[in-house]
């Protein structure tokens, strides 16, 4: 089974995609991760894809335009197979329930704007990657961390991801892909049987 993992290239998306790919490979899936702006992703042959995951980070209330444009250009492929949208944000880990609800609303609006109806949607907490931020971004993120009572020590990164929950969602996605492949194979078998009896 071939699962395609797509991401908009950010530190959080990469970490989450690596984890999802690792779990799926452990279940026997052939999982390939690509950036949505890569030549490989832009030339994707959807006929060879049994499942698709898109991970994109939410920053300043929006997902990256490149991720949205990729989905809009490939929405038929996404909707033809079991698919999963992983929206990565610090808001998903917020102590404020309104922040968490807003992250979910923004993720659903992203899907609606692209006419994408994935089987799964996960709003996943991201990371504060202080060591990789520019000076301005580090300053802004420290302000957000202070508001959330998280570490403001910019010498180390902080991960808020609930990896066990992400693994559970990944296992569910793997089961959905396997079942979809089983049903498709069964339908093709019946179709070939009907063709030989006519």
Ranges and model annotations:
Residues 46-47, 78:
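A short, aliphatic-rich alpha-helical micro-motif
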Residues 1-29:
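N-terminal beta1-alpha1 ligand-phosphate binding loop
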Residues 27-42:
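A short beta-strand-loop structural module common to alpha/beta enzyme folds
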Residues 50-53, 82:
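Structural motif
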């Amino acid at each position: 089974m071939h699962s395609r993992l797509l991401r908009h290239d950010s530190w959080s998306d990469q970490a989450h995609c690596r984890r999802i790919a690792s779990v799926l490979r452990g279940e026997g899936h052939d999982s390939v991760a690509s950036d949505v702006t890569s030549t490989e992703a832009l030339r994707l042959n959807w006929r060879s894809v049994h499942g698709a995951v898109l991970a994109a980070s939410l920053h300043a209330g929006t997902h990256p335009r490149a991720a949205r444009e990729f989905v809009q250009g490939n929405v038929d492929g996404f909707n033809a197979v079991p698919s999963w949208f992983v929206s990565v944000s610090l808001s998903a880990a917020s102590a404020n329930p309104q922040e968490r609800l807003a992250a979910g609303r923004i993720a659903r609006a992203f899907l609606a704007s692209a006419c994408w109806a994935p089987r799964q949607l996960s709003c996943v907490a991201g990371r504060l990657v202080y060591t990789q931020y520019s000076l301005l971004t580090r300053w802004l993120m420290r302000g957000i961390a202070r508001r959330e009572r998280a570490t403001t020590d910019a010498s180390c990164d902080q991960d808020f991801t609930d990896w066990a929950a992400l693994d559970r969602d990944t296992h569910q996605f793997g089961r959905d892909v396997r079942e979809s492949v089983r049903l498709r194979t069964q339908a093709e078998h019946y179709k070939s049987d009907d063709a030989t009896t006519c």
